[in-house]
Amino acid sequence: MAVQTTDNFAFYEQLQHYYQANRRKIRSRYNDLTRKFLAYNDREENPAAFLRLPQFEALEMYVFIKEFMGNPQVYQMFDDWRNRRDRFADASYYSVQKDGQISLLDFGRTTDGRQVYLPDEVEKQTDILFKQMKKYKEKYPNYIYALTMGLGKTILMATCIFYEFLLANKYPRDKRFCHNALVFAPDKTVLQS
């Protein structure tokens, strides 16, 4: 019986699912300034908020990784997630696929589509992913994720920089927040933003 594991796994989807499932608990642990900053940018709480939904969701994930997770390297978050430790100790044992389907992590599929228990195969696959992530780590983890063209990356980046400066000013000794930013603006459109 030939067995294959899933090839459409994306860790950011697991982070997003974890955040959505625990959003209230996570946001309650943010400091007051962060909660006010998010509320100001959230159209559900502030109808006059400037950010559109995809921008706000990206900002929420940025703050989640920065403040709740402690700004770790991606490989560290992935290792904690796959081993269900620290922040992920109470995480569910399933993963969300790109098509929205949920599958158990410890299962794979045979070539004819049947699900089989594969803890060793899954462990091998996640170990390979972990090693790749660790290989490409940066000295200072700082994450800006891709948004499609025209969705407002410039405004989002400016909002993230403002968040960084706001918290760096309030908590100057907290190494999670940057105190400097270098911005290159190639044309007038970016400068107007």
Identify the meaning behind each predicted range:
Residues 1-29, 44-45:
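Charged, low-complexity intrinsically disordered regions
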Residues 18, 61-65, 160, 164, ...:
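Generic, well-ordered alpha-helical scaffold segments in large soluble proteins
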Residues 23-146, 155:
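Conserved pre-motif I regulatory segment
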Residues 64-71, 166-170, 187:
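A generic secondary-structure boundary signal that marks alpha-helix termini
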Residues 137-140, 172-178:
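Short helix-terminating capping/connector loops at secondary-structure junctions
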Residues 149-150:
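The conserved Walker
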Residues 153-168:
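Motif I (Walker A/P-loop) of helicase-class P-loop NTPases
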Residues 154-156, 174-193:
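Conserved Walker A/P-loop ATP-binding site and its immediately adjacent core
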